Amino acid sequence: MTVTYSSKVANATFFGFHRLLLKWRGSIYKLLYREFIVFAVLYTAISLVYRLLLTGVQKRYFEKLSIYCDRYAEQIPVTFVLGFYVTLVVNRWWNQFVNLPWPDRLMFLISSSVHGSDEHGRLLRRTLMRYVNLTSLLIFRSVSTAVYKRFPTMDHVVEAGFMTTDERKLFNHLKSPHLKYWVPFIWFGNLATKARNEGRIRDSVDLQSLMTEMNRYRSWCSLLFGYDWVGIPLVYTQVVTLAVYTFFFACLIGRQFLDPTKGYAGHDLDLYIPIFTLLQFFFYAGWLKVAEQLINPFGEDDDDFETNWCIDRNLQVSLLAVDEMHMSLPKMKKDIYWDDSAARPPYTLAAADYCIPSFLGSTVQMGLSGSDFPDEEWLWDYEKHGHRHSMIRRVKRFLSAHEHPSSPRRRSYRRQTSDSSMFLPRDDLSPARDLLDVPSRNPPRASPTWKKSCFPEGSPTLHFSMGELSTIRETSQTSTLQSLTPQSSVRTSPIKMPLVPEVLITAAEAPVPTSGGYHHDSATSILSSEFTGVQPSKTEQQQGPMGSILSPSEKETPPGGPSPQTVSASAEENIFNCEEDPGDTFLKRWSLPGFLGSSHTSLGNLSPDPMSSQPALLIDTETSSEISGINIVAGSRVSSDMLYLMENLDTKETDIIELNKETEESPK
């Protein structure tokens, strides 16, 4: 019984809705005319009593009562209460329509999945669809008054063809105090499984699709049952109803026209018909009637759902789809656009105005001038001139204590080709902690204050870049890693260290006359750092003044002589200067001991020639048959870059560094 007027409002015209105001079926006039007549009669009766039956004193008292009712009737929040209530009811009404059970998807699946053109196959398909329609009928019969009037008993259901006599006996035999709308679902599932076992449903995927769609259909039916069971709370409906009718009961007295000779505010005119009061009643009471009509769409109102039509339509269409249309196909022919790649159906003369070109986007017609295209230096110009910051950002920048550089720096972009920091960390000289302290892949940069404390003023900075290193040749691990028993005079480290080649760093100093001792200073402590406890070989002991060697005992107890303060400032400033070898093309000479069997490294810091601009950084290698391990005996400050490179000499770029826990005893 739904009132359809979509065709009348298809186009927005001048007074387009005026034709709808004259309809009676489903209109507000049909719903409200009784209440409206009652309100008008009561208002007229009270007005006649005031004007004709009351005495002077009684009129004065009524007038005070009327002013009081008119003043405080507006305190009732009718608009607020009605607005929320009607919104809730309309949403609930539309959700119930969306969840009406439609068997179209199931009939498509049954027609294509249950095979067999014989009588048994036809019986299977029709029975499955009859169970589907029986389920919706049982739900509609329990929630809709119109459907219940059509099928008041189960005999009427059997008579209508939705259920056979045997099925009715089985249905009635099931003793359940609950609504048994779910019984046809069980029958559907059992019959579909039987059809799968018989081969009528050839694939388990098709059976699963049928069950999934049937579960969705069951969800629709159960949702309708839930809407019928749990409605809008009664207290809300009562509040809305009382608010509306109490307001208009107060209006019956408060909106009366009083004697204008008494000079009451707002009562200058004496009219007999309260036009705006009647309109207010029409709107508010009509608003409430909308909620009353939509709160249960399965009734018999003009705008309720056509459930009986749904039952008839679903049964007729579903049986037609699974029976007569099963494997019924029209003959295939070539369409009229067979040789035309751009199919374009014709337009009639009445629809010629709707033939429009395709929409390609809103920016198709937008053009840009040549000045809008950026050149190659657009990024540099953008950074040079700066952003256009908002006012808030400018205020923050003004209040900030951070000083921005006067000229912007050009940003440099670089692609990282390999994880070179795994072997050469990018940090500057850092205090050597222990060999297990492996630098991270992205070590933090050293602070400027630390750099200033490590390097004397005016001394050149060492550059450990990849371009300044000589070629590093890979050697086998067995040729360099051997066992070594530390000397008894040297305190062994409690931490087991990885076996790496021996590295000895000594200082090449200028011939300074001394009284039989070596000048040891904290600033030059790095010059006398020895990484092994092995006694130096003869070739090592025969080095000239450019390669003097200190034993561990000499490091711990420097001999007597001039104090460390007597060392010249020039010697301290040239600690890390490098001596240039005329026969070498590199600024520094690096000779790694992996391919010699052992290593003996000396670091030269003082150049005898004061005019040399780059004193030597000497790393010499000597052969020693006893050397095969490493042990830290001095806590001097050593470059972590150099230390980490020497520890992982045999490690390739894709290897995983492991700590060798095996130790071999060697003769002391």
Curated annotation (Swiss-Prot):
Organism domain of life: Eukaryota
Tissue note: Present in skeletal muscle and weakly in brain, spinal cord, bone marrow and retina.
GO MF terms held by the record: intracellularly calcium-gated chloride channel activity; ligand-gated monoatomic anion channel activity; metal ion binding
UniProt feature, compositional bias: Low complexity: 475-489
Coiled coil: none
Keyword Ion transport: yes
Primary localization: membrane
Protein name from the UniProt record: Bestrophin-3
